[in-house]
């Protein structure tokens, strides 16, 4: 994971890219057993922090993104690039890797 000294407000995704703050992974099982870091699953849910301007169509126009800042999304398990800003973890991914908006 790349450790960089940026802030969320300075990250501007390009094209159809979406910058998502990763939700915290579960610390313990339903039975109360604490999980070590090596046993935790990579989270697939997060909150959209920044959105690019959208994908370019063949005619040069932009297709508006289907997600917006603040949306809670479910994304593909191995999608995107992991980025750590301070103590928070983010993933920069293509909009096509977002599977659903979670209400």
From Swiss-Prot:
One example of a Gene Ontology biological process annotation: chaperone cofactor-dependent protein refolding
Q: Does the keyword ATP-binding apply?
A: no
Gene3D superfamilies, from UniProt? Answer: GroES chaperonin
Cite the InterPro entries for this sequence.
Chaperonin_GroES, Chaperonin_GroES_sf, Chaprnonin_Cpn10_CS, GroES-like_sf
Q: Where in the cell is it found?
A: Cytoplasm
- Keyword check for Disulfide bond, yes or no: no
Q: Please list where the region (Disordered) is annotated.
A: 31-67
What quaternary arrangement does the UniProt entry report? Heptamer of 7 subunits arranged in a ring. Interacts with the chaperonin GroEL.
HAMAP family given for it? CH10
Designated name of the protein? Co-chaperonin GroES
């Amino acid at each position: 994971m790349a450790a960089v000294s940026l802030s969320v407000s300075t990250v501007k995704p390009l094209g159809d890219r979406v910058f998502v703050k990763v939700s915290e992974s579960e610390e313990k099982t339903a039975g109360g057993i604490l999980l070590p870091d090596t046993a935790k699953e990579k989270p697939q849910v997060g909150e959209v922090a920044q959105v690019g301007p959208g994908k370019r169509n063949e005619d040069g126009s932009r297709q508006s993104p289907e997600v917006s800042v603040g949306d809670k999304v479910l994304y593909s398990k191995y999608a995107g690039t992991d980025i750590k800003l301070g103590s928070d973890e983010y993933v920069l991914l293509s909009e096509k890797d977002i599977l659903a908006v979670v209400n």
